[in-house]
Amino acid sequence: MSLILIFFAFTVLKSSKWICANRSVCPI
């Protein structure tokens, strides 16, 4: 259960970073 949650969080973070790099705008 925790492993799935961690994987999900990692996926979201990775996709968020990709969007940040793609749009050249990073909220973080």
Swiss-Prot record:
Domain of life of the source: Eukaryota
Cell inner membrane as UniProt keyword: no
GO cellular component labels: extracellular region; nematocyst
Localization, UniProt: Secreted; Nematocyst
S-S pairs: 20-26
Tissue specificity of this protein: Highly expressed in the tentacles. Weakly expressed in acrorhagi and mesenteric filaments.
N-terminal signal peptide: 1-15
Molecular function GO terms recorded: toxin activity
PTM summary: May be N-glycosylated at Asn-22. Activity with this modification has not be tested.
UniProt keywords, alphabetically: Disulfide bond, Nematocyst, Secreted, Signal, Toxin
Function: Probable toxin expected to be employed in prey capture and/or defense against predators (based on its abundance in tentacles). Has only a weak affinity for lipid membranes. Shows moderate cytotoxic activity against breast cancer cell lines (MCF-7 and MDA-MB-231).
Additional record remark: The 26-Cys-Pro-27 bond exists only in the trans-isomerization. Negative results: does not show activity on voltage-gated potassium channels (Kv1.1-Kv1.6, Kv2.1, Kv4.2, and Shaker IR), voltage-gated sodium channels (Nav1.2, Nav1.4, Nav1.5, and Nav1.6), and the insect channel BgNav1. In vivo, does not induce change in behavior and mortality rates in crustacea (redclaw crayfish).
Subunit-structure text: Monomer in solution.
Designated name of the protein: U-actitoxin-Ate1
Species of origin: Actinia tenebrosa
